[in-house]
């Protein structure tokens, strides 16, 4: 599905250097945020989040379509992550001698950028909107919740 996906434009995305004042500012802002220990786990399983939208509806959840999108987009996202090799905030915080609380999650073991959960949830939301356009608002909200749970 994504065999010929061109990642070149994603290589052009820039972010502050790991040891920059801007990165320090980002870490300090994260330090001020309370650590939410519920949302990251609630929204960790992307397929399940979208499947829940269908739990009270007559429409059937296209499980295979969603799983295929998630599985086949993973190598592309990992390729972009490995290209940028952006450390997770807790790793950068240590470089500034800042103790940053974070949740150790199995799904958070790759470089931080881009967020795989954000990318995949948006991809799933777009695909499901093509199938069920009348549920667009709910799909977009689910993708937004998934993205925000990764902060």
What is each model feature region?
Residues 1-70, 77-94:
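N-terminal transmembrane-helix/juxtamembrane module of multi-pass inner/ER membrane proteins
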Residues 75, 89, 149-151:
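Secretory-pathway/luminal and periplasmic proteins that interact with or process carbohydrate-rich
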Residues 93-151:
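Membrane-embedded catalytic cores of phosphoryl/pyrophosphoryl-handling enzymes
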Residues 66-69, 73, 117-121:
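Solvent-exposed, acidic/flexible segments
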């Amino acid at each position: 599905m994504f065999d010929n996906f061109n990642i070149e434009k994603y290589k052009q995305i820039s972010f502050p250097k790991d040891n920059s004042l801007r990165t320090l500012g980002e870490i300090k802002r994260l330090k001020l945020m309370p650590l939410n220990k519920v949302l990251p786990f609630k929204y960790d399983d992307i397929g399940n989040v979208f499947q829940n939208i269908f739990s009270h509806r007559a429409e059937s959840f296209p499980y295979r379509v969603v799983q295929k999108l998630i599985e086949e987009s993973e190598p592309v996202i990992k390729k972009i992550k490995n290209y940028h090799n952006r450390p997770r905030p807790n790793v950068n915080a240590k470089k500034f001698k800042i103790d940053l609380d974070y949740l150790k999650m199995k799904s958070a073991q790759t470089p931080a950028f881009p967020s795989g959960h954000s990318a995949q949830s948006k991809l799933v939301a777009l695909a499901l909107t093509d199938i069920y356009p009348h549920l667009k608002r709910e799909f977009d909200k689910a993708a937004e919740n998934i993205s925000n749970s990764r902060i």
